[in-house]
Amino acid sequence: MAEQQGPEPAHERAAAGAVGASPAGMPGAVGVDAGGADQATEGAGRPEPGARVAPAFDDRHPPEQELLDDCVHCGFCLPTCPTYLLWGEEMDSPRGRIYLMGLGLEGEPMNDEMVRHFDQCLGCMACVTACPSGVQYDKLIEATRQQVERRWPRSRRDRAFRGLVFALFPYPGRLRWLRGPVRLYQRSGAGRLLRGARLLPRRLRTMERLLPDLPPAAPVAELTPAAGARRARVGMLTGCVQRVFFPQVNAATARVLAAEGCEVAAPRRQGCCGALSLHAGREAEAAGFARRLIAAFDDAAVDAVVVNAAGCGSAMKGYGHLLRDDPAWAARAAAFAAKVRDLSELLSELGPVAERHPLPLAVAYHDACHLGHAQQITAQPREQLGAIPGVELREIEEAEICCGSAGIYNLVEPEPAQELGDRKAAKLLATGADLLATANPGCLLQLRASLARRGARLPMAHVAEVLDASIRGLAVDALGVERPGAVAPRR
């Protein structure tokens, strides 16, 4: 498809507002003094008098011009982009952001507006699925975010909140320490008082509302033997949020794998995979987590590493790219990444041996973006759920649109995340399903909060929990479903 001709394209007209008329007067630009040292201004400040303005990107992994050139500005991405759907702004579309990246490579300085458009991208990769030209927007936005995080002077409040998030969520030990206080807080009713009095800042209010009711801890054994003949020896990522907020999902995952003939190794030394850090542009931090996780599985001697969290699986499959410049780790990272499998992906490769008992349920399956778009895994979860006797799968309208979770997006950009969550909740309820199934803890947290805002109740479960209930012959109430068919029928 030929590039647009004639009048100035919409994305170029809109870019004028994002880059301003004069680089020297750019609000919020990063200045460089005569000696070449970075002079980061605070928020919307201007460079020091006499300073020259630095280009938006430096030489450390900027977005690649070759990848930018793949975009022909055709607009096929627009109907699938969540932020474009919300606001209809060209610069809040993949095409517009790619144009801004190109301006940055040409030497335009980074500024408040440019950073805002990059920050508002969810990184959902729906555009990657939709693009007929094969534009690797995932690599482009990842490289851009790394530049923003290293070079852009965020406000003190923003830095403090992001610092809190990344001092907590990637560390399962710290999250475990909070389990007791959080459970006490939830049982005491203090949350209702705080929410009613609106004492918490906006972002902390969002974090508090996303917290699930914490179940009892259910640590996975370091080695779970296969039931019957061993078909494979697999490693299992226990994760951070999954391990602490959804321990029952990890327990179900290990049981399902064992029932299907897998010996499951879950090394105790494993920690965060680095997904949250990577998706937020914290490249060095993500690389450190990746090295430690690879090392934790070194002695496990596994055929595959199974992941039950979409964002984690997406990041781990990209370890070869993340550590490509590290001669000591590049080959190890690529070999490790080649072994990573989503749970449904591995089960489809193996084929079932465990008997499935009936579950008379209408199940709506929600595609997590980092599974459906980033890993292109859409058929396998449906195949696994559809093989359960009694299960009727119901598709969700706008399945390709993100629910608004997107790593830490719903914490740092709560307003658009809430709009997207409300939109997804309406589509979910319209299916009339008895149960929502998905494959990502962030989606479960986001959708539970979105339904709660509507005063609606729809039981939710991870795909692993649904499979586990069927294999063990449990009743539907084990999944929180009291009366199948109680939700309004599909319209």
Locations of regions flagged by a protein language model:
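Intrinsically disordered, low-complexity terminal tails and inter-domain linkers enriched
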Residues: Q4-R52, P484
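Iron-sulfur cluster-binding electron-transfer modules in prokaryotic oxidoreductases
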Residues: Y137-R491
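Non-heme iron-sulfur electron-transfer modules
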Residues: A2-E3, E42-F57, Y84-R116, G134-G163, ...
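Residue-level recognition of specific faces of alpha-helices
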Residues: D70, R97, H117-Q120, R233, ...
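Cysteine-centered iron-sulfur cluster-binding motifs in ferredoxin-type domains/subunits
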Residues: Q65-Y84, V115-V135, H370, E400
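Short His/Asp/Glu-rich catalytic/ion-coordination signatures at enzyme active sites or charged loops
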Residues: E106, A126, A130, G281
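N-terminal glycine-rich anion-binding loops that anchor highly charged ligand groups
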Residues: G75-P79, E89-P94, C262-A266
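Short, intrinsically disordered, charge-biased short linear motifs at domain edges
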Residues: A56-L68, G107-M110, M114-F118, P225, ...
